[in-house]
Amino acid sequence: LIAGSILAATAPAPVDGQEAEPGPRIAITIDDLPWNGPSPAEGRETATGRLLEALTARGVVATGFVRCAGIAPDASLLRLWVDYGMPLGNHSESHRDLNSAPLDVWLEDVRTCDARLRDVIDGPVRHFRYPMLHQGPTPERREAALEVLRELNYEIAHVSVDNSDFMLSRPYEAAVGAGDAVEARRIGRLLIDHIIAAVRHAQAVARRKVGRDVDHILLLHATLLVSDQIGALLDALAAEGFRFVPLEEALKDPVYRAPDGYTGRSGLSWLYRMEPASPEDANWDDAEAARIRKALHQ
């Protein structure tokens, strides 16, 4: 049996023996904390607070992944996340690329961030996300990195819904900075339409490879665009029938324990990596990125 046929028969178990509610589920994760991009006019703390308020108002527990080199100038932003009850994960100290950085330097980046995050949250850090989703270009390098991550007791925060939100972030910031509300609204709408399209694509890939809906994990970035649009995006996902679950709950889905079938330099969705690997599914991502580039220049 291939991994997909094994996993098809195994959906996540209901919590505490209760009957599971119908409908697909999704976890929200946000990378590059404390903040990615220039400070908005209102300040990063206000923008971060707006993001966290929108999540909390909808009962969403999102996990934020921290680039720890940014902690010193923006420690107050991480305290906001902790105060709102949002878990924090390790995204490394300097966002080094496992494809090209010396392995010892990359691992030290991970260990340094682990120590700094433990001080912030006053406890262990549970989840790690690879910078750029690069997990190692060779089996040897991938396994060497995994060995240290296991020693640190990390669970890998896989992504099932990757997307190009970062392509829209700087044009959005430029529109806001120029006072162009019409263009800012247009880019905000582009973001929501793009994420919904990416989610639908991920659902189709999961159903084809696993034979069922899976608990999805969405990757976003800590930007002004996401801060401003997260409420509308969550509402759009809810309109698609999604219920929101914490990352740790989504990762209980057996799909995230499937064998990794991909070795290479690309940063891929877990649905593309899992056996049988289907990196050709990333052609959709490339076409969607091209559509966004075209839309930005209209």
Protein language model annotation of sequence segments:
Residues L1-A9:
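Bacterial N-terminal signal peptides
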Residues A8, V15-E19:
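Boundary at the C-terminal end of the N-terminal hydrophobic targeting segment
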Residues E19-L133, T138, L218-L219, A236, ...:
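Active-site beta->alpha N-cap acidic-glycine motif
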Residues P40-A41, R96-V120, T138-L152, S160-R212, ...:
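Alpha-helical scaffold elements lining the catalytic groove of polysaccharide deacetylases
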Residues T56-A62, H158, L224-Q298:
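C-terminal domain-boundary segment and adjacent tail
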Residues Y84-L88, R150-E155:
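Glycine-enriched alpha-helix->loop->beta-strand junction motifs that scaffold or abut catalytic
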Residues N90-D97, R116-G123, A181-R200, L268-E288, ...:
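Short, basic, helix/turn surface patches
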Residues G211-L220:
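Conserved short secondary-structure transition element at the edge of the structured enzyme core
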